[in-house]
Amino acid sequence: MARVAVQLTNFTGGELSPRLDGRNDLTKYSSGCKTLENLIVYPHGAAARRPGTSFVAEVADSDNKTRLIPFEFSTTQTYMLEFSNLKIRVYKDNGSVLEGDKVISGITKANPAVVTATSHGYSNGDEVVITEVVGMTELNGKRFLVAGVTTNTFQLTDKDGTNINSTSFTTYGSAGVSNKVFEITTPYTTAQLFDIKFAQSADVMYITHPSHEVAKLSRTAHTTWSLDEVEFTNGPFLDHNITTTTLNPSHKSVGQTTTVTASATTGINGGSGFVATDVGRLVHVKDGHFQITSITSTTIVVGTVIIDLGINSATTTDFALGAFSDTSGHPSCVTFFEQRLVFAG
């Protein structure tokens, strides 16, 4: 009896449950597998072995969790963001994004090795990559932490803080370049990394976390990035006041500093009145709103008028507190929907 090799040309069914063994009456059976390991299934049906991986760099802190988030401007401009405790590092083209060259003019044979680079601008703890050194080539292509910083020199240590002993290295000849690993300072701690949500449009990524103000990560050049708090200038606001509490602003026009006095704490933060965490919060009053800049008491705040308040009388009950603040919390989710930026949570 002839033996027939069955051709399998479609794997879009993926891995099938053991309960489907022998269920050739199901449409998915002919496009499924019992096990698909180290394979990638393409939308057209074919399956291919997954690509390999390579070691690019050690993360900033290997002892704690790190989160990787893609930053995709286009098919040719894609970055990987490494979020760790209070910082972001950026990767592109199989390597870390580095700051500009600092020219090396000398390296000692000592313990620790001391590098001379005029006006390098480094701080203790910075991570640098050294390349193009003639003579003491043992340092080329390696990463070090900076220590013992002076204006024109710095010592080399490894990631654990152990001094780099260069006494047995080849004598420094000439040249060499030092580049600091590019980093962005953030407010996000290790414990908060996996609660971050994000949405990207072109070169801007919006980042939310319930404990922090909405942030905007912007890229203007390969090594020019900024992380700034988003300034909301027109809301959103909570429900309007329905109590008899009134607000009496001293000034009402755009740009003016105003002292606002409440007749009571009722209707303000659940009856607690104004609190320290309200600094930076918007308050809608009549036709406009102001932003709180300081707290005098539970019934008195100082702020800057953003939009004319439009009050004819001295006081009004028509006010609403901003929805986003350190008091009420910040949005935990963000996305784009029909070309609009949407927050939730």
Describe every region a protein language model picked out.
Residues 1-100, 212-257, 313-345:
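N-terminal beta-propeller domains
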Residues 2-25, 95-200, 209-210, 232-252, ...:
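Small/polar beta-strand repeat architecture
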Residues 260:
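Post-transcriptional modification and biogenesis factors for structured RNAs
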